[in-house]
């Protein structure tokens, strides 16, 4: 099958499988809808003063003591602007489609053996033409980086043939494989260089404190700035102060994470979507969640819209299906049937045999004819305030239904230990999905995952149902897009109706600039400076 280079390839299942979920002190049972973002809109609110320019230059935070190498990816601050210095093999757009300005054509008949042809008119900043060997080398080295390793684990082998062609063999068929190759390109042999050569529109100055236009780049003349200045503001308080004083002009914040920072109100705030999915997971060996009815009932009791709009301050997109709502694979009509509905939750619990057998106002269940009091052990990682608040809300909603639930807010180490030991009935989780939307690692039966018995994988549900993995494999191997879409609908229905996991929402990130400084922003999860040539920067 042949693919033109700039034809969007709709992305499907993904997973880098970065779990973050639940946290510390025990909390008793008495404790206590956003549309896809329009990137050039700002948060409505109180009118604020116009920004007073500090220096009439555009500056970003960076870490001068860390490597600039985007393949080693050792500094989150320096990774924020990597796309200004380096091209990537493929680019993932905000609508989860994929394109490339480096790869002119790619072919695969079985989605295992892939052949890629590159544009050799592209040059590094020293004038050296880009070669297939450079691209293959960058991907090979990225496999060794913890930042990219999970998504590139699919690769069995890679090699270059001539100056403009390289081939990749994957371990299994994946029609969405190019979506995983959002990998920066460095020159062959530069992996251990802290400032490797790149082909992007900018290059690092000799002093290392600014980005200057790369005269070899085909888009250099389209860039909105001749120079982007870099300032060392790695100290948190210094970074906040520098932004408020306009010494730096753009910051990215994760309002749902443990490093959420507070910036003042004299800003314009834009959001961009991510593939980080929050969800509820269940221990299928727990006597409370042996049935799909009991698990699905919890889904009806979770007010996703309230969690996103109130507890996450709009920094999320509510979802009931295991794919981002902005994806073409998200079936809105089907999803609405599983939205927040306490009445449906009560009916589902009743169908699962959960009732008030002793008329004490709390629900019980029958186990071999014996009335058993409910006391669901719900765990969450305490490192994230947003996750803790969401878990508390869900705990509260279950208790209001008479489902006695106790929330345990655990440190990260204790949380992971509890998951591995199965010491939970329900957990609040997060997973960073890769842009092929592949969640099979959450369901793969453990005994067949690895010969390394110390590695248990992420099947914390302890399901032995091979149906999930089979559905994902069928979907990833489909030749035609229409068949892939139908296969993904089958995945969504199977996950939703068995309730092994219950998606809650997808995170969004904040991109903050000073008022009136930047327009035309179309940031993505993978590239803050996506389409930077279309930005307008005003420093007057």
Q: How would you name each of these model-derived features?
A:
Residues 4, 60-109, 140:
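N-terminal lobe/hinge region of extracytoplasmic solute-binding protein
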Residues 23-31:
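Bacterial lipoprotein signal-peptidase II cleavage site
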Residues 54-64, 113-116, 166-168, 200-205, ...:
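Short, well-ordered beta-strand elements
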Residues 76, 94, 170-238, 342-343, ...:
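Gly/Pro-rich hinge or "lid" segments in bacterial periplasmic/extracellular proteins
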Residues 104-146, 288:
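Aromatic- and charge-enriched surface segment that lines or borders ligand/interaction sites
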Residues 212, 290-396:
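Append "and occasionally in soluble cytosolic enzymes with long acidic Gly/Pro-rich linkers
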Residues 216-261, 404-406:
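Ligand-site clamp/hinge motif
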Residues 301-332, 386-395, 420-540:
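Detector for C-terminal structural segments
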């Amino acid at each position: 099958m042949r693919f033109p280079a700039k034809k969007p390839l709709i992305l499907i299942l993904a997973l880098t499988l970065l779990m973050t979920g639940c946290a510390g002190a025990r909390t008793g049972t008495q404790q206590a809808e956003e549309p896809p973002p329009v990137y050039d809109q700002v948060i409505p609110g109180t009118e604020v003063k116009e920004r007073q320019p500090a220096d009439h230059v555009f500056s970003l935070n960076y870490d001068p003591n860390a490597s600039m190498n985007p393949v080693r990816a050792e500094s989150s601050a320096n990774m924020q602007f990597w796309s200004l210095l380096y091209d990537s093999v493929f680019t993932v757009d905000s609508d989860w489609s994929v394109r490339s300005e480096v790869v002119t054509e790619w072919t695969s008949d079985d989605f295992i053996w892939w052949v890629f042809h590159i544009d050799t008119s592209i040059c590094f900043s020293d004038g050296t033409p880009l070669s297939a060997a450079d691209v293959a080398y960058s991907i090979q080295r990225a496999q060794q980086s913890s930042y990219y390793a999970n998504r590139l684990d699919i690769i069995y082998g890679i090699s270059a043939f001539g100056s403009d062609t390289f081939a990749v063999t994957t371990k299994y068929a994946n029609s969405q494989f190019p979506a995983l190759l959002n990998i920066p390109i460095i020159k062959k042999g530069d992996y251990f260089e802290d400032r490797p050569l790149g082909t992007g529109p900018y290059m690092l100055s000799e002093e290392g404190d600014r980005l200057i236009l790369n005269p070899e780049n085909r888009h250099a003349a389209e860039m909105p700035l001749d120079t982007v200045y870099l300032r060392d503001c790695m100290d948190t308080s210094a970074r906040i102060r520098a932004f408020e004083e306009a010494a730096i002009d753009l910051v990215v914040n994760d309002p749902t994470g443990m490093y959420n920072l507070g910036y003042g109100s004299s800003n314009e705030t834009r959001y961009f979507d991510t593939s980080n999915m929050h969800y509820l997971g269940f221990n299928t060996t727990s006597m409370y969640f042996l049935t799909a009815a009991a698990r699905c009932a919890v889904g009806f009791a979770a007010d996703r819209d309230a969690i996103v709009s109130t507890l996450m301050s709009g920094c999320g997109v509510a979802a009931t299906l295991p794919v981002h709502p902005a994806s073409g694979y998200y079936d809105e009509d089907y999803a609405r049937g599983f939205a927040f509905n306490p009445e449906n939750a009560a009916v589902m619990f009743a169908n699962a045999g959960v009732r008030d057998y002793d008329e004490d106002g709390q629900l019980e269940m029958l186990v071999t004819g014996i009335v058993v009091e409910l006391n669901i052990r719900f765990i969450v990682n305490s490192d994230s305030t947003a996750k803790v608040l969401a878990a508390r809300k869900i705990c509260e909603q279950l208790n209001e239904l008479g489902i006695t639930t106790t929330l345990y807010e655990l440190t990260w180490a204790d949380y992971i230990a509890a998951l591995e030991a199965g010491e939970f009935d329900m957990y609040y989780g997060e997973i960073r999905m890769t842009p092929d939307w592949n969640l099979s690692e959450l369901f793969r039966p453990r005994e067949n995952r690895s010969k390394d018995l110390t590695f248990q994988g992420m099947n914390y549900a302890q399901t032995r149902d091979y149906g999930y993995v089979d559905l994902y494999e069928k979907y990833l191997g489909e030749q035609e897009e229409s068949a892939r879409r139908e296969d993904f609908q089958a995945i969504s229905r199977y996950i939703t109706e068995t309730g092994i996991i219950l998606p809650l929402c997808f995170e969004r990130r904040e991109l903050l600039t000073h008022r009136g400084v930047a327009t035309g922003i179309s940031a993505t999860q993978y590239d803050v400076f996506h389409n930077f040539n279309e930005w307008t920067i005003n420093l007057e």
